[in-house]
Amino acid sequence: GCCHIIACRMGCSPCCW
């Protein structure tokens, strides 16, 4: 659950990469 742009930029979510 953290696919938001902020989470992406914080390196939180693999689904964003």
Swiss-Prot record:
Modified positions (Methionine sulfoxide) in chain numbering: M10
Tree of life domain: Eukaryota
Compartment(s) of residence: Secreted
Main location as per UniProt: secreted
GO molecular function ontology, one term from the record: toxin activity
Protein name in UniProt: Conotoxin SI.14
Domain remark in the UniProt entry: The cysteine framework is III (CC-C-C-CC).
Keywords tagged on the record: Disulfide bond, Oxidation, Secreted, Toxin
